[in-house]
Curated annotation (Swiss-Prot):
The gene is MED26C. Pfam families: Med26 (PF08711). InterPro entries: MD26C-like, TFIIS/CRSP70_N_sub, TFIIS/LEDGF_dom_sf, TFIIS_N. One of its GO terms (cellular component) is nucleus. This is Probable mediator of RNA polymerase II transcription subunit 26c. Component of the Mediator complex, a coactivator involved in the regulated transcription of nearly all RNA polymerase II-dependent genes. Mediator functions as a bridge to convey information from gene-specific regulatory proteins to the basal RNA polymerase II transcription machinery. The Mediator complex, having a compact conformation in its free form, is recruited to promoters by direct interactions with regulatory proteins and serves for the assembly of a functional preinitiation complex with RNA polymerase II and the general transcription factors. Residues 241-256 have a biased composition (Polar residues). Belongs to the Mediator complex subunit 26 family. The lineage of its organism: Eukaryota, Viridiplantae, Streptophyta, Embryophyta, Tracheophyta. It is found in: Nucleus. Keywords: Coiled coil, Elongation factor, Nucleus, Phosphoprotein, Protein biosynthesis, Transcription, Transcription regulation. GO terms for molecular function: translation elongation factor activity. Residues 298-327 form a coiled coil. The modification Phosphothreonine is found at residue 84.
Amino acid sequence: MDLDDFRSVMDNAGVDVWTFIDTAILVASLDYGQELKRRRDNIVERLYATSMANKCRNCDFGGGGNVTEAAIGRVNNGRVHEETEEEDEEGVTAAAEEEVREKSVNVEDDDDFDPFAGLFDDEQKSIVEIKEKLEDPDLSEESLVELLQNLEDMDITFQALQETDIGRHVNRVRKHPSNNVRRLAKQLVKKWKETVDEWVKFNQPGDLEPPSLIADEDSPVQKALHNGSRQQVPDFGYSPVPQNGYSSSSKNSNITEPERKPRPVAPQPRRESPSPAKPSRPSPSQQTIPRDKEHKEVDFDTARKRLQQNYRQAENAKKQRTIQVMDIHDIPKPKKGGFFPRKGGSSQGGRHW
């Protein structure tokens, strides 16, 4: 487009050049996103190049910024003439290459309006590139370890995890034959799980339902979902249950509370009446056990007493039945005197033995 024609368009629209540029970038990002991604490097290079008025507006800067000719369109009697003009090639290319190499593009952040619509997020771009490389089945162990280490060095947010879907690809290499690969994969999954836990803590269950980032049935969060957790959350790593997992315990309590409220209405008094009676009242079999023990002890005592009495009686009987055998000479002699008592006080009438 000719410069004069462009100026006339802005005058007719009643907008300045900066509003026109912002609107053009926004429309390009919405309607021609892929084309804008392909052209954005050249656009940034042109922004930092010098002498823009002397450059061709339609030439391609894909060759690293080497510009040798510039065309200026002029209107003369309805015909467009192009004139070429040589520039200082070394100065232009050196400045452009230095700016591109150092990546010193400083764009002011605007929270209310994002004209680039997130297209210049270098972190997400790197994550997507790593994800594409992880899809290669012939990837060597060294390359895989390097990619996982690069992911570990990044501070990936929940939004980046959700948009790039890197969690699923890393979760697939948790069962890799290499110990280093398995260790790095588990560390990443654990780190990202903590990020998801923080996001869940600061967001109410009913506000948003983020899609699961890893569809692995071995993950604890996926098991928690099968066990009754209805809130859809990303699945990462091992969690004893936190999980069980993580804050799903609070969610499960919130979900099960309304189910427990109607239950105590009728069954509780029925269950309470027999429950305290069981430990207080021993069964008949339990009551007979101590009684049998007491009877046995009493029987033992009486039997012991009877035996002792029998032994005593036997000893006494033996003593009574003992016959003393004595020699005739050992028999004691009777005392002197009459057998019959004396009469009359005289000793002559009596007999002596």
